[in-house]
Amino acid sequence: EIGSGLVGSEMCIRDRNTADWTRPSALPNWHNVNIAQCFREPATYYMMTGDSAMLKASYNVHNLIRRTFGQVPGGMFGADENARMGSIDPRQGVETCGLVEQMASDELMLCMTGDPLWAEHCEEVAFNSYPAAVMPDFKGLRYITCPNQTVSDSKNHHPGIDNRGPFLAMNPFSSRCCQHNHAQGWPYYAEHLILATPDNGVAAAMYAACKATVKVGDGNEISLHEQTNYPFEETIRFTVNTPKAVSFPFYLRIPSWTEGATIFVNGKKVAANPEAGQYACINREWQDNDQVEIQLPMQLSMRTWQVNKNSVSVDYGPLTMSLKIDEDYVKKDSRATAIGDSKWQEGADASQWPTYEIYAKTPWNYALVLGKNEPLKDFKVVHKEWPADNFPFTVASTPIEVKAIGRKVPSWVIDQYDLCSELPEMDAPKGEKEEITLIPMGAARLRVSAFPNTRE
């Protein structure tokens, strides 16, 4: 009854408690968190009204902000509080709140539409941006994280970034909006790995090791056990446990970046050729302990950001790579630099919850050397052991590296705002060739992930 009442009066009340997010060429607000949360609002009304214009509006907002401010790796956009015209370089950042709200919206858009685009985008943010915004032990986070970020300190970097204050340090007492909000990131992600489908089946929409109990077919309860180290591994394995034989469709998302994906059921290859960017469906009678294996080959690829000085990013499957920068962690008193409205608990022991500032111990101002005809021909992927603590998002623990060649760009330095300066021009003088190492940008709390480059 409530739902039908809303449908009948939708035109009158849709914007009563929020702004109008259906404008075709402008946004009602340029705050990163508002955008990450509210772009899904029209699609929510589409679920009640069936008006396809509402669904189209949500897609439009997602694309609109990225056409200008999101020409960077990591899945987000430059809005270090608010997006500002002229501030589109990858040294602009986004709030940790914005990262997890984007993930949550992607997950809800996935549920509303079934479009694999939203699963893939959620993975891009989850693997490449969110992990670097927090300390490995989750006892501190920074308000702003950028695709190119070579300092993480307690200084005020305005107007290099939009907001005024100590927003780049890993401070557990400061920026309480993010302290509360970021904890939704991984739990909501886990919640949306395995989804029900309208035909009484089940879909593996996003990938991570998990166990799920679901109802399929005529209401039969089964469990799925997923085993993988994805996105650091190409193979994902599922075990189906069911008390009796049951028929249902099992959907597997095939990412758009893979070529030659293969699926095996109980060791036998499924005949169909899975299409990248779509779902593969296995519709059969399932028995207890049936095994499903999907292999998603990963290759090196490159994106060019033309509006940002033709900078490039290097991807390996769903992972975007960043320069490996040795990090110097400096412990600080969290109370000394927390912003005024933080209001931490009175009995909080600052010695147990220190702030960390992070500084570069090795040079960061490299251009990538690309091949003229085959840009990535000299790039080599190196696989390392899986970390003993099961946390792959640090410089020391990441199990994947890429060896490459770089040249230093002497003019690319820390600027007057104590930030990594904007990308240099393509013809900026460069130094001698050096071997450099790239690591997944989610493991790099200091990072260069959009590179100047030279083709040789």
Stretches found by the model and what they are:
Residues 58, 119-128, 133-241, 275, ...:
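C-terminal beta-rich recognition modules with glycine/proline-rich loops and embedded aromatic residues
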Residues 228, 240-244, 253-256, 284:
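Non-cytosolic beta-sheet module surface loops
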Residues 47-68, 89-139, 149-150:
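Catalytic-core region of carbohydrate-active enzymes that cleave or remodel glycosidic bonds
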Residues 4, 30-47, 94-110, 179-189, ...:
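Well-ordered alpha-helical segments within folded domains of soluble proteins
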Residues 1-8, 12-13:
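Single conserved hydrophobic/aromatic residue that forms the stacking wall/gate
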Residues 248-251, 282-297:
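C-terminal beta-strand-rich structural cap/linker in extracellular carbohydrate-active enzymes
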Residues 258-283, 302-307:
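Solvent-exposed beta-strand/loop surfaces of large extracellular or lumenal domains
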Residues 245-265:
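Beta-strand-rich binding/interaction modules
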